[in-house]
């Protein structure tokens, strides 16, 4: 058993333990610390009486006040929903164009649309609608299926080549794999991709460009338009073929990527959000996307 020892310099007893010749003084706690400790104990006892504290199986002590953070949260959520109800009802009853003409509804729809976009759309289209490889930019004026409020609303609602009965485009279809399916030879693909490069002011072989135009007219113009203006501008419905004279490419506008695209084809799909989101939410999204900067 350790033996207490009184320190000669301070006159204070030690704890009786020694480590490498070092002894710990057995000083009492400061009075202020001790009193504060007692106050904390007293406060804890008062808290136990007034507030929820002890778990009891599947329940718990409720306290005299019967306070519940969960009930407070539910109350505040219900209050918030009640405040939003009139706006959501109005949005559900109006068209997207009508919503944009109503200053109050527009502000509410933009705020909600931003939140819905970040939660449901940003993973593919980017937080600011800047797009990514294979996912269209929503902040420019190049639209594959139309950039009006009504067009955007319909696209979000029914999707692109989705399993929705009113989807835009035909499910299971897309751009033909001209090389993989044996429709064009490697030389023809080389020529037509040089032709597309020339349309964008990029270096291309003049001899290939002339032959590539013929290949384009015979195989590509039906969807992309006679002047590569895209299906929308060419009035070709239900295709969604992009313009081929632009700066923002869906998959890339360099030679290698163009060859890959023509050889293997492309087939983008977007889900029909009407199966996951209510109509007011979809309209708010349409308003938000339309106002990202490229809406028609």
From Swiss-Prot:
Residues on Periplasmic side: 53-296
Annotated keywords: Cell inner membrane, Cell membrane, Electron transport, Heme, Hydrogen ion transport, Ion transport, Iron, Membrane, Metal-binding, Oxidoreductase, Repeat, Respiratory chain, Transmembrane, Transmembrane helix, Transport
UniProt-annotated binding residues for heme c 1: 121, 124-125, 270
BP GO annotations: oxidative phosphorylation; proton transmembrane transport
Membrane topology label: Single-pass membrane protein
Domain Cytochrome c stretches: 108-200, 207-293
Gene3D superfamilies: 6.10.280.130, Cytochrome c-like domain
Binding-site residues for heme c 2, renumbered to this chain: 175, 220, 223-224
Localization, UniProt: Cell inner membrane
Pathway stated in the Swiss-Prot or TrEMBL entry: Energy metabolism; oxidative phosphorylation
Transmembrane segments: 32-52
Family assignment from sequence similarity: Belongs to the CcoP / FixP family.
Function as written in the Swiss-Prot or TrEMBL entry: C-type cytochrome. Part of the cbb3-type cytochrome c oxidase complex. CcoP subunit is required for transferring electrons from donor cytochrome c via its heme groups to CcoO subunit. From there, electrons are shuttled to the catalytic binuclear center of CcoN subunit where oxygen reduction takes place. The complex also functions as a proton pump.
Subunit structure: Component of the cbb3-type cytochrome c oxidase at least composed of CcoN, CcoO, CcoQ and CcoP.
Protein name in UniProt: Cbb3-type cytochrome c oxidase subunit CcoP
Species of the source: Azospirillum sp. (strain B510)
